[in-house]
Amino acid sequence: MERIKELRNLMSQSRTREILTKTTVDHMAIIKKYTSGRQEKNPSLRMKWMMAMKYPITADKRITEMVPERNEQGQTLWSKMSDAGSDRVMVSPLAVTWWNRNGPMTSTVHYPKVYKTYFEKVERLKHGTFGPVHFRNQVKIRRRVDINPGHADLSAKEAQDVIMEVVFPNEVGARILTSESQLTITKEKKEELQDCKISPLMVAYMLERELVRKTRFLPVAGGTSSVYIEVLHLTQGTCWEQMYTPGGEVRNDDVDQSLIIAARNIVRRAAVSADPLASLLEMCHSTQIGGTRMVDILRQNPTEEQAVDICKAAMGLRISSSFSFGGFTFKRTSGSSIKREEELLTGNLQTLKIRVHEGYEEFTMVGKRATAILRKATRRLVQLIVSGRDEQSVAEAIIVAMVFSQEDCMIKAVRGDLNFVNRANQRLNPMHQLLRHFQKDAKVLFQNWGIEHIDNVMGMIGVLPDMTPSTEMSMRGIRVSKMGVDEYSSTERVVVSIDRFLRVRDQRGNVLLSPEEVSETQGTEKLTITYSSSMMWEINGPESVLVNTYQWIIRNWETVKIQWSQNPTMLYNKMEFEPFQSLIPKAIRGQYSGFVRTLFQQMRDVLGTFDTTQIIKLLPFAAAPPKQSRMQFSSLTVNVRGSGMRILVRGNSPVFNYNKTTKRLTILGKDAGTLIEDPDEGTSGVESAVLRGFLILGKEDRRYGPALSINELSNLAKGEKANVLIGQGDVVLVMKRKRDSSILTDSQTATKRIRMAIN
């Protein structure tokens, strides 16, 4: 207040104003400060000062011919003064207004295309709904969020090449457009932006917004998808929040969401197969999300989620160095530890072999609904500061931290035996055994933990074993805070290794991720996920397995048929028949398999008993390890639609219906496709008709390699010999004729020779 009075006093003296306004500033330091470098030192002041002048803007001389000297109100729009140091004229802001209202119109067709992200944002806001404002304490935590809705996921380098190719196609410089998405986008944009008059620099800038994911590390309390982040300033303040539902979705959020669902499904499925890592890779490579290959999305998309990171690790990509436990992401912020195997006794006197971390360490824990800071020493929790959305979330974080601390009182709180198993029926490792046990019921754990008196610290409060807050007492070392803990901000990625059982380790051998950490939450994907791998057939239930298995046989009939006659064991062991086994009652799988294999062998031995329909129908039943028995079956049971349904060995049934005339297969009333066979297969003169131009030499001769199908014969050179599979599943040796003249006689002799060769 005193200072202000003093200044007022000074200003009232006549000389002061004169000195301040007229005197030159000649102190070198000040001149240097404000004139060195191109960077404006005080932009807002500069702007205000400029706009206070009459003609703060410069324009091209042509403006004087296109804009009148005065507007309708008689205000001057431009000055006859030239701009010092350029041949431009000085213009009033009013000239801009005049130009916007009365200036020439150009084609606006390219605007929505170039400024696509802005137009779409306006649409989303127009159709969005803003709800009531609530005043409450906001627990915000900084998270890395996507601030740019509606973008593709190109890397900066890929985008740069696309932009150069679209905007400056004639510029020199090597540009390599390799990825599918780069080529598609380039083609699309070149067509859209033909004859575009908008400045190339602007187009380039807008394209960048469309192609590259931009992330910022921002304090967020609610939704983190990009359509929520674009209105962050409208939906949450320090002490208020406004409910908001976006008026539209954007593909990048949908890709992130669908990628997580696909990755979870794949990891869960791979974990229960014989070779999890190989299965996982097979599935990632054969899956598409919204029409894009999943492996391409994984390479470009920075989403960090347990299942997604396991898939990335399997592909040899780098991932974040934080590790996951109990659904929380742990990041060590200080300290270090060494690991030692120890045997510990639970309260039930069960022995657990645990890798104990020896040493003092501090971690941040970030989960979906709670965050915490954890300080621990060897098998001792020193301090845990938690904040969460509600009591339940806080409790979850406390349980995870208590188990992670490996404290004795936690191990002694175990009641009953620990025998949790994963989806593949393998026992979980001891740390996850403990976690599951206490997640089911933490009462004893909290009761046995111990409580202490607490000091009154701003923003912190105690929590009792029954999860009620208290200002006097708290569970030992544990406090609840109003402030959230920020997510780990670094985008650094590290090289990791993955073992056969999908455990991901960093280069020091610490386990960062394992299938146990993959969430069981089921969601509905926003984009269509197409799993081409047979391993994922069961994701839509038993009927889908049934239909997919038979469709696979029909689609691959040519190769299946050859294998059936030449190498049946290899055919029976195909992974495509694996899902089908779960439909056959366990007790009888072996007998069915033995029965079908014997039946097939008879077909191979006895001429003329080859039956396409029957082979297709019974093939999946031959996949289980066979039990030798004398049992005969007239029908085979499969468990679909909640009960056992029968497939007849001879003839059609509601489950399997094959129409011989149309060659259409119907499974449970659903169309399962049409069998495309060799022409005329199954008619009597097949062999003679098809083998015109070939000489039949006799029985199959293994030296000439595996049997070809009739369609493949055309590739033979004249005089070349080959084994060929003919209509009834029999194999004969043929030679392509050297002369074409004798083709006619082949038809008659072929039939006789085949009979002889086979018999």
Curated annotation (Swiss-Prot):
This is Polymerase basic protein 2. The record marks K627 as: Mammalian adaptation. One of its GO terms (molecular function) is RNA binding. It comes from the Viruses. One of its GO terms (cellular component) is host cell mitochondrion. Belongs to the influenza viruses PB2 family. It holds the Pfam family Flu_PB2_7th. Keywords: Cap snatching, Eukaryotic host gene expression shutoff by virus, Eukaryotic host transcription shutoff by virus, Host gene expression shutoff by virus, Host mitochondrion, Host nucleus, Host-virus interaction, Inhibition of host innate immune response by virus, Inhibition of host MAVS by virus, Inhibition of host RLR pathway by virus, Inhibition of host RNA polymerase II by virus, mRNA capping, mRNA processing, Viral immunoevasion, Viral transcription, Virion. InterPro entries: Flu_PB2_2nd, Flu_PB2_6th, Flu_PB2_C, Flu_PB2_CAP-bd, Flu_PB2_middle, Flu_PB2_N, INV_PB2, PB2_helical. The gene is PB2. It comes from Influenza A virus (strain A/Hong Kong/1/1968 H3N2). Plays an essential role in transcription initiation and cap-stealing mechanism, in which cellular capped pre-mRNAs are used to generate primers for viral transcription. Recognizes and binds the 7-methylguanosine-containing cap of the target pre-RNA which is subsequently cleaved after 10-13 nucleotides by the viral protein PA. Plays a role in the initiation of the viral genome replication and modulates the activity of the ribonucleoprotein (RNP) complex. Influenza RNA polymerase is composed of three subunits: PB1, PB2 and PA. Interacts (via N-terminus) with PB1 (via C-terminus). Interacts with nucleoprotein NP (via N-terminus). Interacts (via N-terminus) with host MAVS (via N-terminus); this interaction inhibits host innate immune response. GO terms for biological process: 7-methylguanosine mRNA capping; cap snatching; DNA-templated transcription; symbiont-mediated suppression of host cytoplasmic pattern recognition receptor signaling pathway via inhibition of MAVS activity; symbiont-mediated suppression of host gene expression; symbiont-mediated suppression of host mRNA transcription via inhibition of RNA polymerase II activity; viral RNA genome replication. It is found in: Virion; Host nucleus; Host mitochondrion. A motif (Nuclear localization signal) lies at residues 736-739.
